[in-house]
From Swiss-Prot:
This is DNA mismatch repair protein Mlh3. Its main location: nucleus. Keywords: Disease variant, DNA damage, DNA repair, Hereditary nonpolyposis colorectal cancer, Nucleus. Residues 624-650, 933-960 are annotated as: Disordered. One of its GO terms (cellular component) is nucleus. Heterodimer of MLH1 and MLH3. Interacts with MTMR15/FAN1.
Length: 1453
């Protein structure tokens, strides 16, 4: 029959569940005092009688309220459902006092209301309330006192499970946590058993000061404030910049209510440990003591310190999950977790404590916690309507993926400019404001010659524009003296100029910054470096950039196509172009200043490729603006690369000498000959300004500065500066071709993630990860495009150089069309003197413009940690357009141009010789028409398939990975009819060895062009059909080589990879296929394993992931020949066999295994046999097997060979079927460890105590150990228990933070003696401190339960066992080996050494070896042979003996 429970039973059940501990009782009473707006709360606890008293000075209660207080569901804090949905107090159910009254034998509540004289009191006995009455003793002030007597008197089991000493510490911890959110309230805690004041926290101003009161000044000084708001959640509080050895200093509050063990704790703890350097263990001597308690663990961990409060609406969460209200559930976990993640990340970046998460950490976090980190980028509020979507996305990329690793950099002063006059100073300040501090730098020049830096709009009267794109650019104009500096806006035009000279420039810019080099007349060359911050650069540049389409500014252009250019970086350098007259004019103005300014940066979505367009053939009246470079983003074209007809060469001394004059921060060129300019014949009647660009960069890990003096037609340095050449006449200057040093943009191999790509190329300046790179220097991962004129007849310099020389042969005719430049790479080890003579005869013009670029291949030197980069930036960006080929030419030219004496270039000289042979054959046919010559050019940066309209011969701009050439469009043509198959095969195979596995290149054949087809204006001889065919072939080849399409999602701010075959998408870059020879042999068979229980499974031990990196690259020639066949147009599709198509197909579901993973013919059969044996016959050692071991002998003075029986039945005989090797050092170490453990305990145990006691040694004088107040209290409470572990404490009254250790375990003293005997420092104090901290942690976490042997003691004993054990190379006799194995068999854990490493290893089961079968004798045949011997053999023997007896002996004469 169902009946209703009585009210008393209901109260008992409810109260027993609601009040589970004494600490919770204290917390409920303290929260009531805080709700009463008390300014002082005092707590007194007696753990012997379970008495609690809480006194406050709050509002107090009158007689009516005292009469109702303590009744269930009576409260003054909540009166309606609206109050319940939006509570303003901690309590709202009216049950706390009623539950406490039910759990205690007596409860007394006395209260006095403010401005009254009477004090009222109410008593509860055994849960029943007595009538309230006036108290005999009047309170001194208003407030309430609640006294609880004999708590849990009816629940003895609950009392017993609570350790009084540990429960008191929990009470203290609860009050401390409560006080952190209420610093304006004073708290105190008194222990009535000892009469000591345990906690006394006066009022303070803020949380940080309260933290200082609790944990000391040292901890509080490390606190850093955090404040963050996202949607309905707001974070506030403090995070420490140092870590702690446990989680006791982690406090998380929700609306000032402490919560425990939530997802938020896991997330914050993970972010502080993995995404910051806070919890990274430091190896310095100062932090060793802090981490000493965890040194015995394999991976010592530190934990963050934080006090964080989350403010939100009460409807967002439910805290009533359990009575203590420390568990919480949120309505929208994702929003809160994202708020926490972004807030902590922002804090770490501000404090320079941020490190990038690794993929392994993120995966491990998701698997362990059931929820993953958020990848979505925090959207910022748009302050201006003019900002477009792609700019927002780029802002997000910059904000989300910046790295703020702590880096050590050389100290340098900021470059300051003196104020020449007040007018220009005010103008510069106004300019700074107009540009929103976009890093405008003003340099004051002290020399007599001063360049006027101007950037006017392009007005090219003689050029025809075939395609034009523009970008708004804000420039700074440094006007004449007396004029104000104006903030102008000019437009940059990119155009393909079809002028008579056919000159166009190409520039490939990088988001990295290079040093600026300025040269003044009569002055030394100074190298200025800019040191800027990433935050200001990213914010200011993106804030003020806009793309506007204003084709009206280009009135002289015949055809203008205006469109915004996405994801491009536009940089521009201000340079001067002046005639000799202007220089003389300006030389008198000594107060003139040069203004150099950074350009603004655009981040959109196609490429970082930019062009520089030269203003050609201007009239004398326009001399000032005659030579300007303009930049626009977009892909380059072959026409712009090879369209230069005139040239200019620069002679420079040895780069080594030049580099030696450069310091790390600033370098000087002492002689003017270093920048001497030679002008070759050409259009000498056109006044054109020339300038030389200098660049310093850091080479490898040597950090050496190297200067390269470059001429100027195709500037290809990132963040370049133009330096005016004032030391030469400018009346007769010509355009010239310039060596290009191109920064190869590629992913670093350290992180290997797409986030790294966006981080590196999505912002202006980035603190690089690699050691050899700095944000203020050009990285050394560069490729060259060089078209200089090198004097080939200078035999001495050519032959004595250590690098491959690059020679340009260019034909100068009277008409305006120019020949394409060709290049020779000459090797020191493979000189072709005949070819050089041939070249000298054919190129007379080379003798007139000498130039030797020594050590030029230093630009191509690649840092070791970047050599694994497999994809260039251009190939990634080309995939975004959908019509480009992915190339993997990273490091091809870099490796090729290295010094021959380096280890990594042993094969390069061979390549050089092959290339030289091919080029000599090419030059022999220089003036012939190119017939069906496939001209491979590695050009992963430009892929527009457009060609020079002024050249007479045709070059191919397609890409191939089989040619070892630079990344930039360096024409390396060869004639198929001239190059033998052997040479090309050597070239192909050598390049294959250099770059590993290659994609299939797309090949194209272009129509040959007759020499007479070129005229002065140039002819575009590529028809629309050929363009369409080229595009289609490129797409087909791209499909063959990669089934993945890249797409940049603006909303997510991430790159998405979409599989063209299946439509599946992923954020992770897919890996390339591994090509291996497809052969079948013994290694391809599967192994069937039958277990003892009858189950069967199949395994293929050869197909392990561990051996994939060591796959043999067999039959690579077949793959290369197949790729060579694709270079022809007709065989592009037809040569695709079913097998080749299948090898390129990437299964989207299952990973494909190679056909042959290990080549057993190369000496790996033995290891495979062991692996198969271990799979087929797994063995598990037992202690019973050790007794059956039979010692054979010692092996190599390191191991003991034994036979062990694996049979389950015991026959008592030694020996067996399994051959094992026993490590003699590990075995003896285990024997010594167990013996030392036995000897460490006292032999006779005390009467009545079931625990063993460690032997101790008395220290004279006692050891002084500094502890915290909490640790001292715990040690005082548990000092009797710690005596069993050999520790004896004395607590002096003079200091609260000091204990004296009178006795320590005996092994500690023995360890100290060994250390001192070896001349080392004392270790006893550090070991004792670690031992004490370990035991205190164990007391708090396990409730006082002790383990068998403390880990610290075991570690000391293991060290002693190791030092005294038998070492390797100690010879042992058979008897000594037998005694060692016998002692090992008596150990408790014979299979491991003292440190946990295995002591024995099975080799083989002799039962599985092939036994030698003895053939049974054929008795019938033996019988017949015996009979035959008796009949014939015996008679013959008798006859021989008779003849010997009848013959006389031979006597000597």
């Amino acid at each position: 029959m169902i009946k209703c429970l009585s009210v008393e039973v209901q109260a008992k059940l409810r109260s027993g569940l609601a009040i589970s501990s004494l600490g919770q009782c204290v917390e409920e009473l303290a929260l009531n005092s805080i709700d009463a707006e008390a300014k002082c709360v005092a707590v007194r606890v007696n753990m012997e009688t379970f008495q609690v008293q809480v006194i406050d000075n709050g509002f107090g209660m009158g007689s009516d309220d005292v009469e109702k207080v303590g009744n269930r569901y009576f409260t003054s804090k909540c009166h309606s459902v609206q109050d319940l949905e939006n509570p303003r107090f901690y309590g709202f159910r009216g049950e706390a006092l009623a539950n406490i009254a039910d759990m205690a034998s007596a409860v007394e509540i006395s209260s006095k209301k403010n401005r009254t004289m009477k004090t009222f009191v109410k008593l509860f006995q055994s849960g029943k309330a007595l009538k309230a009455c006036e108290a005999d003793v009047t309170r001194a002030s208003a407030g309430t006192t609640v006294t609880v007597y004999n708590l849990f008197y009816q629940l003895p089991v609950r009392r017993k499970c609570m350790d009084p000493r540990l429960e008191f510490e929990k009470v203290r911890q609860r009050i401390e946590a409560l006080s952190l959110m209420h610093p304006s309230i004073s708290f105190s805690l008194r222990n009535d058993v000892s009469g000591s004041m345990v906690l006394q926290l006066p009022k303070t101003k803020d949380v940080c000061s309260r933290f200082c009161q609790i944990y000391g000044l040292g901890k509080s000084q490390k606190l850093r404030e955090i404040s963050f708001k996202y949607k309905e959640f707001e974070l506030s509080g403090y995070i420490s910049s140092e870590a702690h050895y446990n989680k006791n200093m982690q406090f998380l509050f929700v609306n000032k209510r402490l919560v425990l063990r939530t997802k938020l704790h896991k997330l914050i703890d993970f972010l502080l440990r993995k995404e910051s350097i806070i919890c990274k263990p430091k190896n310095g001597p100062t932090s060793r003591q802090m981490n000493s308690s965890l040194r015995h663990r394999s991976t010592p961990e530190l934990y963050g310190i934080y006090v964080i409060n989350v403010q939100c609406q009460f409807c967002e969460y439910d805290v009533c999950m359990e009575p203590a209200k420390t568990l919480i559930e949120f309505q929208n976990w994702d929003t809160l977790l994202f708020c926490i993640q972004e807030g902590v990340k922002m804090f770490l970046k501000q404090e320079k404590l941020f490190v990038e998460l690794s993929g392994e950490d993120i995966k491990e976090f998701s698997e362990d916690n059931g929820f993953s980190l958020f990848d979505a980028t925090l959207q910022k509020r748009v302050t201006s309507d003019e900002r477009s979507n792609f700019q927002e996305a780029c802002n997000n990329i910059l904000d989300s993926y910046e790295m703020f690793n702590l880096q050590s950099k050389a100290v340098k002063r900021k470059t300051t400019a003196e104020n020449v006059n007040t007018q220009s100073s005010r103008d510069s300040e106004a300019t700074r404001k107009n540009t929103n501090d976009a890093f405008l730098y003003i340099y004051e020049s002290g020399g007599p010659g001063h360049s006027k830096m101007t950037e006017p709009s392009l007005q090219n009267k003689d050029s025809s524009c075939s395609e034009s794109k523009m970008l708004e650019q804000e420039t700074i104009v440094a006007s004449e003296a007396g004029e104000n500096e104006k903030h102008k806006k000019s437009f940059l035009e990119h155009s393909s100029l079809e002028n008579p000279c056919g000159t166009s420039l190409e520039m490939f810019l990088s988001p990295f910054q290079t040093p600026c080099h300025f040269e003044e007349s009569g002055q030394d060359l100074e190298i200025w470096k800019e040191s800027t911050t990433v935050n200001g650069m990213a914010a200011n540049i993106l804030k003020n950039n806009r793309i506007q389409n204003q084709p009206k500014r280009f009135k002289d252009a015949t055809e203008v196509g205006c469109q915004p250019l996405p994801f491009a970086t536009t940089l521009w350098g201000v340079h001067s172009a002046q005639t000799e007259k202007e220089k003389k004019k300006e030389s008198s103005n000594c107060g003139r200043r040069n203004v150099f300014s950074y350009g603004r940066v655009k981040l959109c979505s196609t490429g970082f490729i930019t062009h520089v367009v030269q203003n050609e053939k201007t009239k004398s009246t326009e001399t000032e603006h005659s030579f300007k470079n303009y930049v626009r983003p977009g892909p380059t074209r072959a026409q712009e690369t090879f369209g230069n007809r005139t040239r200019h060469s620069v002679e420079t001394p040895d780069i080594k000498d030049l580099a030696s004059t450069l310091s790390k921060e600033s370098g000087q060129l002492p002689n003017k000959k270093n920048c001497r300019t030679n002008i070759s014949y050409g259009l000498e009647n056109e006044p054109t300004a020339t300038y030389t660009m200098f660049s310093a960069f850091q080479e490898g890990s040597k950090k050496s500065q190297t200067d390269c003096i470059l001429s100027d037609t195709s500037p290809s340095f990132p963040w370049y500066r133009h330096v005016s050449n004032d030391s030469r006449k400018t009346d007769k200057l010509i355009g010239f071709s310039k060596p290009i040093v191109r920064k190869k943009l590629s992913l670093s191999s350290q992180l290997g993630s797409l986030e790294k790509f966006k981080r590196q190329y999505g912002k202006v300046e980035n603190p690089l990860d690699t050691e050899v790179e700095e944000s203020n220097g050009v990285t050394t991962n560069l490729s060259l495009q060089v078209e200089p004129d090198i004097l080939l007849k200078d035999k001495n310099r050519l032959e004595n150089s250590d690098v491959c020389k690059i020679t340009t042969m260019e034909h100068s005719d009277s008409d305006s069309s120019c020949q394409p430049a060709s290049h020779i790479l000459n090797s020191e080890k493979f000189p072709f003197s005949k070819d050089e003579d041939c070249l000298e005869q054919q190129m007379p013009s080379l003798r007139e413009s000498p130039m030797t670029l020594k050590e030029l291949s230093l630009f191509n030197r690649k840092p070791l940690d970047l050599e694994k980069s497999s994809e260039s930036l251009a190939s990634k960006l080309s995939r975004l357009k959908g019509s480009e080929r992915e190339t993997q030419t990273m490091g091809m030219m870099s490796r090729f141009n290295e010094l021959p004496n380096s280890d990594s270039s042993r094969k390069d000289s061979k390549l050089c010789s092959v290339l030289t042979q091919d080029f000599c054959m090419l030059f022999n046919n220089k003036h012939e028409k190119t017939e069906n010559g496939v001209i491979p050019t590695s050009d992963s940066a430009t892929q527009d398939n457009s060609f020079n309209k002024n050249s007479k011969t045709h070059s191919n701009s397609n890409t191939t990975e089989n040619c070892v050439i630079s990344e930039t469009p360096l024409v390396l043509p060869y004639n198929n009819s001239k190059v033998t198959g052997k040479d090309s095969d050597v070239l192909i195979r050598a390049s294959e060895q250099q770059i590993g596995s290659l994609d299939s290149p797309s090949g194209m054949l272009m129509n040959p062009v007759e020499d007479a087809t070129g005229d002065q204006n140039g002819i575009c001889f590529q028809s629309e059909e050929s363009k369409a065919r080229a595009c289609s072939e490129t797409e087909e080849s791209n499909t063959c080589c990669s089934d993945w399409q890249r797409h940049f999602d603006v909303a997510l701010g991430r790159m998405v990879y979409v599989n063209k075959m299946t439509g599946l998408s992923t954020f992770i870059a897919p890996t390339e296929d591994i090509q291996a020879a497809c052969t079948k042999d013994l290694t391809t068979v599967a192994v069937d394993v039958v277990l003892e229980n009858g189950s069967q499974y199949r395994c293929q031990p050869f197909r392990s992931d561990l051996v994939l990196p060591f796959l043999p690259r067999a039959r690579a020639e077949r793959t290369v020949m197949r790729q060579d066949n694709r270079d022809t147009v007709d065989d592009t599709v037809s040569s695709e066999s079913l097998q080749s198509l299948f090898s390129e197909w990437d299964n989207p579901v299952f990973a494909r295994y190679p056909e042959v993973a290990v080549d057993v013919s190369s000496g790996q059969a033995e290891s495979l046999a062991v692996k198969i044996h271990n799979i087929l016959y797994p063995y598990r050692f037992t202690k019973g097997m050790i007794h059956s071991m039979q010692v054979l002998q010692q092996v190599d003075n390191k191991f003991i060979a034994c036979l062990m029986s694996t049979k389950t039945e015991e026959n008592g005989e030694a020996g067996g079927n399994l051959l094992v090797l026993v490590d003699q050092h590990a075995a003896h170490e285990r024997i010594r460890l167990e013996q030392l453990i036995i000897d460490s305990y006292e032999k006779q145990q005390a009467q009545g105590s079931g625990r063993k006691k460690l032997l101790s040694s008395t220290l004279i004088p006692p050891l002084e150990i500094t502890v915290t107040e909490e640790q001292r209290r715990l040690l005082w409470c548990y000092h009797k228990n710690l005596e069993d572990l050999g520790l004896e404490f004395v607590f002096p009254d003079t200091s609260d933070s000091l204990v004296l250790v009178g006795k320590v375990p005996l092994c500690f003293v023995e360890r100290e003696a060994n250390e001192l005997r070896r001349g080392r420092s004392t270790v006893t104090k550090s070991i004792v401190e670690e031992f004490i901290r370990e035991q205190l942690e164990l007391l708090q976490t396990t409730g006082g339960i002790q383990g068998t042997l403390p880990l610290t003691v075991q570690k000391v004993l293991a060290s002693q066992a190791c030092h005294g054990a038998i070492k390797f190379n100690d010879g042992l006799s058979l008897q000594e080996s037998c005694r060692l194995i016998e002692a090992l068999s008596s150990c408790q854990l014979p299979f491991q050494c003292a440190h946990g490493r295995p002591s024995m290893l099975p080799l083989a089961d002799i039962d599985h070896l092939e036994q030698e079968k003895q053939i049974k004798p054929n008795l019938t045949k033996l019988r017949k042979m015996a009979q035959a011997w008796r009949l014939f053999g015996k008679a013959e023997c008798d006859t021989r003996q008779s003849l010997q007896q009848s013959m006389p002996p031979c006597e000597p004469p």
